[in-house]
């Protein structure tokens, strides 16, 4: 993806404005209680900015995958179209109210909220009900998505996107509304996400290691292919490692393996070798005969998995090897766990990687980025999330960004016009970069070494021209 500088909420007046903010409040809810409020907390800086500047917030989000109803469907006698108890955002309104320490109004129908919007005053916050209760939100038919977008756009003066987690979706609330309003601004979370990914993809401190795990090679093909041209080390773990190991002729027992992807695995390993990327695969394993937790799983002595056993985590030798590689790198990006970390007996590999990255970040200045989804959950569970440079809120979005794809929800936002070269430059991704630490292009001077050389050449050229003209004038005067 070409990451282009985008206008943010710092670039627009917010006073007395009704600001429609697309947030990602797709949080886990159990028995009406939110079990992890990370995504809600991540949106607070943007909300607080609008309130501080004298605007009012209209928040919209999805939660889960409700079946939904069409806008044209008959309205039920009680309730709203498409409503599902398990997917209501009402618990989120209560949680947000506690975090903001102020009342958060709730509109039970996102497309019939005009009366709630009309009552908004400076500093007020309104949360709309789940936008996915209407199928038009994710409709592939442009006219349907546009119809929903027009209703939502009518509520507001400005549109702000802070939902990086759904930035890979071309939907009514991500792309339709800014199209209707003619502009769209990045919130602080969106800005931060793109800034960090731009840095690690475009100009990372080196060496750079990509740690890739998860179940299937097929899920990470595009990521691996795109990253091979950017990284120095590739660390592979999780079930996908055993497709690579079988491709190398190793014994993998009954471990998960994509038989139809063996040639692809060989091809990726060959490409890595051609590009000078060192690939590291597990050299020992934590195994069991069944996919279940046990008190004492088998730890192999070498790379081969015994017959009748499946590998469910990386072993201690592999952990040590991976820790050493992370320790010698300046940047690390991690997408996918090393094992079945949800079971404590198979969590050591994943948690060790998290610990190595967290320690490296705090002690040695490692640029560490966690790619959302299960990896973010693992980092949280390990207690190391707080020590990372950045933990992404977007699983699918971060994956597509690492695959080199364009994110529709980012591309639609208003481009930033950069005039001249001020002292505070911004990263080409849309993130503010007021310091050398946060902007990749400023680590070697204002625009890197190339810029400095160019300026020196210009100065020398101007000096030589001046000397030449001066000599000609002196010659004429003497004559």
Curated annotation (Swiss-Prot):
ATP binds at residues 215, 220, 239, 311, 342, 374-375. ADP binds at residues 214-215, 220, 238, 311, 335, 341-342, 374-375. Mg(2+) binds at residues 215, 219, 374. CDP binds at residues 214, 219, 238, 336, 341. GO terms for molecular function: ADP binding; ATP binding; metal ion binding; phosphoglycerate kinase activity. Its cofactor is Mg(2+). GO terms for biological process: gluconeogenesis; glycolytic process. It catalyses: (2R)-3-phosphoglycerate + ATP = (2R)-3-phospho-glyceroyl phosphate + ADP. Keywords: ATP-binding, Glycolysis, Glycosome, Kinase, Magnesium, Metal-binding, Nucleotide-binding, Peroxisome, Transferase. Its EC number is 2.7.2.3. CDD domains: Phosphoglycerate_kinase. Signal peptide: none annotated. AMP binds at residues 215-216, 220, 239, 311, 342. GO terms for cellular component: cytosol; glycosome. (2R)-3-phosphoglycerate binds at residues 23-26, 39, 61-62, 64-65, 132, 168-169, 216. It is found in: Glycosome. Pathway: Carbohydrate degradation; glycolysis; pyruvate from D-glyceraldehyde 3-phosphate: step 2/5. PROSITE patterns: PGLYCERATE_KINASE. Belongs to the phosphoglycerate kinase family. Monomer. PANTHER family: PHOSPHOGLYCERATE KINASE, PHOSPHOGLYCERATE KINASE 1, CHLOROPLASTIC-RELATED. This is Phosphoglycerate kinase, glycosomal.
């Amino acid at each position: 993806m070409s990451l282009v500088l985008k206008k943010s909420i710092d670039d627009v007046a917010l006073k007395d404005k009704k600001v429609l903010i697309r947030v990602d409040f797709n949080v886990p809810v159990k028995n009406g209680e939110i079990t992890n409020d990370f995504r809600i907390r991540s949106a607070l800086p943007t909300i607080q900015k609008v309130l501080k500047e004298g605007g009012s917030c209209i928040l919209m989000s999805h939660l889960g995958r409700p079946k939904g109803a069409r806008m044209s469907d008959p309205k039920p006698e009680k309730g709203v179209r498409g409503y599902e108890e398990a997917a209501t955002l009402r618990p989120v309104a209560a949680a947000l109210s506690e975090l903001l320490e102020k009342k958060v109004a709730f509109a039970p129908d996102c497309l019939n909220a005009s009366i709630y919007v009309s009552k908004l005053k400076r500093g007020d916050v309104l949360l709309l009900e789940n936008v996915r209760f209407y199928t038009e939100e994710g409709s592939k038919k442009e006219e349907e998505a546009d119809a929903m977008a027009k209703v939502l756009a009518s509520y507001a003066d400005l549109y702000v996107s802070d939902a990086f987690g759904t930035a890979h979706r071309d939907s009514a609330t991500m792309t339709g509304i800014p199209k209707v309003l003619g502009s769209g601004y990045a919130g602080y979370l969106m800005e931060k996400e793109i800034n960090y990914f731009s840095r690690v993809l475009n100009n990372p401190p080196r060496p750079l290691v990509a740690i890739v795990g998860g179940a299937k090679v097929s899920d990470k093909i595009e990521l691996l292919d795109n990253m091979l041209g950017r990284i120095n080390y590739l660390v592979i773990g999780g079930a996908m490692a055993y497709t690579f190991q079988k491709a190398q002729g190793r014994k993998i027992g009954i471990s998960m393996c994509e038989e139809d992807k063996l040639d692809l695995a060989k091809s990726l390993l060959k490409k890595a070798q051609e590009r000078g990327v060192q690939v590291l695969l597990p050299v020992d394993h934590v195994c069991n005969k069944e996919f279940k937790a046990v008190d004492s799983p088998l730890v192999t002595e070498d790379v081969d998995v015994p017959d009748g056993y499946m590998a469910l985590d990386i072993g201690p030798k592999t952990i040590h090897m991976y820790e050493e590689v992370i320790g010698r790198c300046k940047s690390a990006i991690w997408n996918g766990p090393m094992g079945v970390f949800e079971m404590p007996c198979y969590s050591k590999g994943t948690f060790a990687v998290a610990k190595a990255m967290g320690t490296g970040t705090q002690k040695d200045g490692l640029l560490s980025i966690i790619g959302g989804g299960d990896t973010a959950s693992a980092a949280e569970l390990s207690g190391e999330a707080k020590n990372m440079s950045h933990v992404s809120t977007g699983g699918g979005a971060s994956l597509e960004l690492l695959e080199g794809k364009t994110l529709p929800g980012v591309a639609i936002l208003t481009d930033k016009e950069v005039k001249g070269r001020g002292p505070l430059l911004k990263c080409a991704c849309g993130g503010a970069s007021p310091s050398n630490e946060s902007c990749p292009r400023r680590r070697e001077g204002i625009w890197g070494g190339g810029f400095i050389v160019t300026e020196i050449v210009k100065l020398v050229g101007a000096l030589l021209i001046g000397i030449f003209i001066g000599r000609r004038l002196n010659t004429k005067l003497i004559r």
